[in-house]
Amino acid sequence: MSSKNSIILCTHNEAKHIEKTIFELEKHIKDLEIVIVDDSSTDGTIEIIQRLNQNNKYKVIYRKKSRNLASAFVRGLTETSGDKIGWIDTNMGELASRFPEMIDELKSDKDLILMSRYIKGGGDDRIFIRAFCSKYFNVLCKLILRVPIKDFTSSIFIMKRKVLDEVTFLGYGHGDFFLEFLYNMHQKEFKIKEIPYIQKKDDEISNSKSAPNLIKFSWLGFLYILRIFVTLIRKKN
């Protein structure tokens, strides 16, 4: 297995962020492999990726019929070759500078390092309704699943590839796929460590406050809660 750090980027209309995120990853991570999975972007994201990838240094998958974060991540996972695998939300490129710290943490007995908003030193600067709902959803996850993790909906992590020998990512859903993965890791007694980060304010406050976006946010929240109970039912079976 290659001694690389494979980072997966899942994109859909990320023209504002993709170039900066790739730049920050390349700036801060040694022995880097970038895998990009694009789901039918129409805002110029594809053209930016193609321009940056003229020398074919990234692995890029273009999907025309799918817009599903979980399946995009799983598809990217199949293209990785590193002994460490990570993921970062494409609009959080400024936090790529934290990956060296996370990679160093993996040199210990820890199997996955997770950036967390809800431990000492972390925080959430988004609009109140999003920050409030996200925090207490994570409290609910911890209470129901009985897993000692405070941020199940983090957008940044890195793990040892060996975890995949015993735990599988289920490729459906939105960010809730990671919730179930963390639960299954805990059941298999893998070691998870959280390190703090502060989530920035929404990039477009006006849009974040709009009714359609809050409706979508509420719907995703419902699906996340549903995933908690599906996870428990799957365990019993």
Q: Whereabouts are the PLM-identified features?
A:
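Short, acidic, metal-binding catalytic loop of nucleotide-sugar glycosyltransferases
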Residues: F23-L32
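A conserved acidic beta->alpha catalytic loop
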Residues: D38-E47, M92
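Conserved donor nucleotide-binding strand/loop of the catalytic core
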Residues: L32-V35, I46-E79
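Acceptor/aglycone-binding surface of glycosyltransferases and processive sugar-polymer synthases
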Residues: R63-E79, K84, S97-G175, K201-F222
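Acidic helix N-cap motif at the loop->helix transition within catalytic regions
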Residues: K16-K20, D43-L52
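Hydrophobic helical membrane-anchoring modules
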Residues: M1-N5, C10, K16, K20, ...
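Short beta-strand-to-loop acidic/aromatic patch adjacent to the donor-nucleotide binding site
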Residues: D83-G93
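Active-site acidic short loop of glycosyltransferases
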Residues: S2-S3, D31, N55, T80-D83, ...
